[in-house]
Swiss-Prot record:
This is N-acetyl-gamma-glutamyl-phosphate reductase. It is found in: Cytoplasm. It comes from Campylobacter jejuni subsp. jejuni serotype O:2 (strain ATCC 700819 / NCTC 11168). Pathway: Amino-acid biosynthesis; L-arginine biosynthesis; N(2)-acetyl-L-ornithine from L-glutamate: step 3/4. Belongs to the NAGSA dehydrogenase family. Type 1 subfamily. The active site is at 147. InterPro entries: AGPR_AS, AGPR_type-1, NAD(P)-bd_dom_sf, NAGSA_dehydrogenase, Semialdehyde_DH_NAD-bd. The lineage of its organism: Bacteria, Pseudomonadati, Campylobacterota, Epsilonproteobacteria, Campylobacterales.
Length: 342
């Protein structure tokens, strides 16, 4: 028997990827597409490549008969929309940032709004499947992690958990394709602005910073402050992070490989690459995999960690489906058994 799901925000890039994945999921029926601006428009007219013969509607959510609702909506939308009564009727996976951070003051600092739903904020489960699997299985509201966040946390988590690095030395240099900025038209994302160009943005201000710090702090069991700098690169999709940290003791590469293996050997979507094989975005493109590898610089006594994901899949829609699978006791990789399209 299939579960019935709905999607708000299916017209965006992450929303379209969600539709594409769910159409190939054997245990899911997409029965509702919500929109306030595209009511009556058939989804195939918007995305001719996607064979979903369903029109956008604008119904009161309390009227819907769904098992699960995905929210691929802008920030600040779901914080006002969700309530306990709705969560009694259906499970929710929110792809926005509205329920990712536990401290309401972080929303005032980083997102410039006062969170209106602080009780639900405390009850939401952070949907990083490899870290919080058991909590996700029991959750009614899952906050799907950000794309940079997913790649950064997964790449560094074992080092923080084992406390083998100087936490104050951590620097994350991240690069993302343009789809990470969303589908809305912006001058800075026009072809002539991004083609043959690489640029940093939101220095010391990127909103994924507190998310990364919060969950690496949980791993380290102490407050973490790190440096995160994102860059926009001229490609459609993909994230590559290069992270640097000072080692606290003299460790060899095999020592660190043993640590990563300890934490990730049983995870279906994390690939610890062989020595000397460094992650590339094309190896994870259109897949739900996270590729990780590292090198120890004996000269500087630093570990250099590389991580790569597809920002729209493992960084958004694929991870949302992975969360859904856990919430409904499906196989974790159900509907996600696809590899990179080189």
């Amino acid at each position: 028997m299939k579960i019935k799901v709905g999607i708000l925000g299916a017209s965006g890039y992450a929303g379209n990827e969600l539709v594409r994945i769910l159409l190939n999921h054997p245990k899911v029926e997409i029965s509702y597409l919500g929109s306030s601006s595209s009511v009556g428009q058939n989804y195939q007219d918007l995305y001719p490549n996607t064979p979903l013969n369903l029109c956008f509607e604008n119904k009161n959510l309390d009227e819907l008969e769904l098992d699960l609702l995905f929210l691929a909506t802008p920030h600040k939308f779901s914080a006002k929309l969700l309530n306990e009564n709705l969560l009694k009727k259906m499970k929710i996976i929110d792809l926005s940032a509205d329920f990712r951070l536990k401290n309401p003051k972080d929303y005032e600092l980083w997102y410039k709004f006062t969170h209106p739903n602080q009780e639900l904020l405390q009850n939401a489960v952070y949907g990083l499947c490899e870290l919080y699997k058991e909590e996700i299985k029991k959750a009614s509201l899952v906050a799907n992690p950000g794309c940079y966040t997913t790649c950064s946390i997964l790449s560094l988590y074992p080092l923080f958990k084992e406390k083998i690095i100087d936490f104050s030395s951590v620097i994350i240099d991240a690069k993302s394709g343009v789809s990470g900025a969303g589908r809305s038209a912006k001058v800075e994302n026009l072809f002539c602005e991004v083609n043959e160009n690489i640029k940093a943005y939101n220095l010391a201000l990127h909103r994924h910073t507190p998310e990364i710090e919060e969950h690496l702090s949980y791993a380290a069991k102490e407050k973490i402050t790190l440096q995160f700098t994102p860059h926009l690169v001229p490609m459609q999709r993909g994230i590559l992070i290069s992270a640097y940290a000072n080692l606290k003791e003299d460790l060899q590469e095999q020592d660190i490989r043993d640590i990563y293996t300890k934490y990730y050997q049983n995870n279906k979507f994390i690939r610890l690459l062989p020595p000397q094989s460094l992650p590339q975005t094309r190896w994870v493109k259109s897949s739900n995999f996270a590729d990780i590898n590292f090198s120890v610089d004996q000269r500087t006594k630093r570990v250099i960690v590389l991580g790569a994901i597809d920002n729209l899949i493992k960084g958004a829609a694929g991870q949302a489906v992975q969360n859904m699978n856990l919430m409904f006791d499906f196989d974790e990789d159900e509907g996600l058994k696809f590899f990179a399209n080189l």
